[in-house]
Each structure stands twice: as C-alpha cells, then as structure tokens.
Amino acid sequence: MSGYSAPRRISDADDVTSFSSGEPSLDDYLRKRALANHVQGGSRCFVTCRDGRVVGFYALASGSVAHADAPGRVRRNMPDPVPVILLSRLAVDRKEQGRGLGSHLLRDAIGRCVQAADSIGLRAILVHALHDEARAFYVHFDFEISPTDPLHLMLLMKDARALIGD
C-alpha cells in the first residue's frame, strides 16, 4: 500500500505513543504489552508505519479451540482441542481508518498463518472480535462464527490459502 511500510516485527525503536484506534484495550496492548509479549515469545506483533509512526498492527499466537466451540467444518476429523493460530489483536489508527489498511493487515496476517501451517499442524485461524462491527469485518473475509459465541470466529486454513491465492 502506498505510503505505508510493509508489516514487520515490532521493535523498541517503534513510536507507538500516539497510536489511537478508538479501542482503549487495543491501544493499551500496543503501548504497554506488545513489545514485551513479542520479546518473551507470548505472541508475535507486526506493525506498519507511516512517516515513522506506527499506524496499524496485529498480533499472532498459538492456541487451540474445543470441539464444542468450533464450527462443524473446523472440528471435522480433528483432535479435541483443535490446533489453531490466534489472531489476538488487529487495529488501525483512527487517522488511517477507511483506507483499506485493516484489510491489508488481515491479509498479511493470514499469509503468515498459512506459512506457519506449512510447518506445524494448524486447522484454522481464530479471532475474538471485540464487537459486532469487528465481527462483520471478519465475516466479510469468510470467517465462520463459533456455535457458542457470536464474537469468536474461525477461518479454515484451506479457505485462508484460497483467500490469499496460495
């Protein structure tokens, strides 16, 4: 995308102080925990910048989901719990929203998940949407809603591959 850096791993040199997505929990995560979680191996955080300032980010972590919480296509022929990769956070600064950056970051995250699935067993990508608007964003990208929580959504790895043209 024009004007934005390619998503890359967060570093201590990144300016996150003015980041404001409109979601305090996401802003606080980026400012207070993203780098430490990244360094300590709890998650991997990727940022994109404009003019030297972080304007978007996402975080990935390993996880699992119980059969009862997974849509039928996700749990079919899988162990319980089902191995997944968790897209734990995704946010765009308010000043950059509405320009396609969120979609770009999601596609980048999906691409990294597909690469990971080539090396380890992963059935799906799991997200915990914060609210109905976020859920609609993920549904637009073919994420399926959990039968037990309408804000938990999953994307099968085969659908992820199709989405990014892999």
From Swiss-Prot:
Gene3D superfamilies: 3.40.630.30. Disulfide bonds: none annotated. Keywords: Acyltransferase, Repressor, RNA-binding, Toxin-antitoxin system, Transcription, Transcription regulation, Transferase, tRNA-binding. It catalyses: glycyl-tRNA(Gly) + acetyl-CoA = N-acetylglycyl-tRNA(Gly) + CoA + H(+). Disruption phenotype: The tacA-tacT operon is non-essential and can be deleted without an effect on growth in cell culture. GO terms for molecular function: acyltransferase activity, transferring groups other than amino-acyl groups; tRNA binding. It holds the Pfam family Acetyltransf_1. The keyword Transmembrane does not apply. Residues 1-22 are annotated as: Disordered. The active site is at Y138. Its EC number is 2.3.1.-. Residues 1-162 form the N-acetyltransferase domain. Induction: Part of the probable tacA-tacT operon. PANTHER family: ACETYLTRANSFERASE (PTHR36449:SF1), ACETYLTRANSFERASE-RELATED (PTHR36449). Homodimer, forms a complex with cognate antitoxin TacA. Toxic component of a type II toxin-antitoxin (TA) system. Overexpression of this gene alone in M.smegmatis inhibits growth, while overexpression of the tacA-tacT operon does not. Acetylates glycyl-tRNA(Gly) but not other tRNAs, blocks in vitro translation in the presence, but not absence, of acetyl-coenzyme A. Peptidyl-tRNA hydrolase (pth) counteracts the product of this enzyme in vitro. Neutralized by cognate antitoxin TacA. Does not seem to be active in laboratory growth conditions. Belongs to the acetyltransferase family. GNAT subfamily. This is tRNA-acetylating toxin. It comes from Mycobacterium tuberculosis (strain ATCC 25618 / H37Rv). The gene is tacT.
